[in-house]
Amino acid sequence: MNYTEFFTNRSTSEISKDLLGRTLSYNNGEEILSGTIVEAEAYVGVKDRAAHSYGGRRSPANEGLYRPGGSLYIYSQRQYFFFDVSCQEEGEPQGVLIRAIDPLTGIDTMIKNRSGKTGPLLTNGPGKMMQALGITSRKWDLVDLNDSPFDIDIDHKREIEEIVALPRVGINQSDPEWAQKKLRFIVSGNPYVSDIKKKDIKKNHGFI
């Protein structure tokens, strides 16, 4: 798949929005674990106070953001790991964080990996999603998507009723401008979106 083209040549916000409805899958060597992407956040580089590359910060820890579009940037916070894909040309450190998936295949294994958690608690957040997939290290950090056990189906996507743009989660409120920027994109009404209220959940999970 031409991930480089998909993850470049347009804004990172557009890329993040376009990921919604597409299938993210992981081959663990025994089976394919997969789900529909329902929540993604854009991080727009050196000007973005919430980005790991803000101000041009560059280190071995965030090098993935500086790689060509379609490279993996996997990082950890506490015991959790997070799945980012770099966007834009090499040296332009922007990326998209996949925050949640609506599970499709390998669900029993996901439940086991999440110690028995079921329903939305299975994958309704970036750390939970990676735990459900069984990712417990940064092994695939810096690797091109094409050379990894991960796959994003850029040729097909589910039809979505409505995409909503919201402020990102966990952003430092000391900078109101960036804290309130609507760079998080969700499938409206999907129960696996990380902070959705029960009254807002749709029976069709927001798909047509």
UniProtKB/Swiss-Prot annotation:
Key word Cytoplasm present: no
Coiled-coil boundaries: none
Transmembrane segment boundaries: none
GO molecular function: alkylbase DNA N-glycosylase activity; DNA binding
GO biological process, one term: base-excision repair
Enzyme class: hydrolase
Keywords: DNA damage, DNA repair, Hydrolase
SUPFAM superfamilies: FMT C-terminal domain-like
InterPro entries in the cross-refs: Formyl_transferase-like_C_sf (IPR011034), MPG (IPR003180), MPG_sf (IPR036995)
Keyword DNA damage among UniProt keywords: yes
EC number, UniProt record: 3.2.2.-
PANTHER family found in the cross-reference section: DNA-3-METHYLADENINE GLYCOSYLASE
Family: Belongs to the DNA glycosylase MPG family.
Protein name per its UniProtKB record: Putative 3-methyladenine DNA glycosylase
Organism: Lactobacillus johnsonii (strain CNCM I-12250 / La1 / NCC 533)
